[in-house]
Amino acid sequence: METVSAVNQTLPISGGEPVKFTTYSAAVHKVLVMINAGILGLLQLVSQQSSVLETHKAAFLCFCVFILFYAVLRVREAMDVRLQPGLVPRLIGHGSHLFGGLAALVLVSVVSTAFSIVLFLLWFIWLSAVVYLETNKPSACPPQLPPV
């Protein structure tokens, strides 16, 4: 049996978990890209001055580094989820979500530092809950030892 994921690719169903995670992860990545693009647009509207780049040079450099890590982990996640479903590809996926969210928070901190701190706390609680629930799922069958 096969299903169609959010990016119109057929994926085999073997329990449904890889498909659910791929759909969830694709939705998170779409939201992250829209948020980062929206914040960049907001920065253009709020400050029409070139001095913003010079006063917040470290923040923009940090944003670029986070986006680079986000892109590398996103590509790695896309390759790993299709090849080998399991814990490591999911943690790589959550890591890419982490860096994409941090990139957005760095841009928000340029506009309002206090608001970005509140968002960071809420976002960290959410990410911790997702990773905790993901890593503590009971397995369907106990691990078997190899034959001696």
Swiss-Prot record:
Lumenal-side positions: 47-51, 111-116
Where in or outside the cell is it found? Endoplasmic reticulum membrane
Function, please?
Calcium-permeable cation-selective channel conferring a broad-spectrum clubroot resistance by supporting cytosolic Ca(2+) increase in root pericycle cells. Triggers immunity toward fungal pathogens such as Plasmodiophora brassicae (Pb) and induces defenses. Also permeable to sodium ion Na(+) and possibly other cations.
- Which Gene Ontology MF annotations are present? calcium channel activity; monoatomic cation channel activity; protein homodimerization activity; sodium channel activity
**Which parts of the chain does the record assign to the membrane side Cytoplasmic?**
1-25, 73-90, 134-148
Reaction catalysed by this chain?
A: Ca(2+)(in) = Ca(2+)(out); Na(+)(in) = Na(+)(out)
Q: What induces it?
A: Accumulates in the root pericycle upon Plasmodiophora brassicae (Pb) infection to prevent pathogen colonization in the root stele.
Q: How does it sit in the membrane?
A: Multi-pass membrane protein
Protein name (Swiss-Prot/TrEMBL): Calcium-permeable cation-selective channel WeiTsing
What keywords are annotated for this sequence in UniProt? Calcium, Calcium channel, Calcium transport, Endoplasmic reticulum, Ion channel, Ion transport, Membrane, Plant defense, Signal, Transmembrane, Transmembrane helix, Transport
According to the record's subunit comment, the protein's assembly and interactions are: Forms pentamers with a central pore to produce an ion channel.
* Spans traversing the lipid bilayer: 26-46, 52-72, 91-110, 117-133
Gene name as annotated: WTS
Q: Can you name a GO cellular component term?
A: endoplasmic reticulum membrane
Q: Name one GO biological process term.
A: protein complex oligomerization
Q: Which InterPro entries match?
A: Ca-permeable_cation_channel
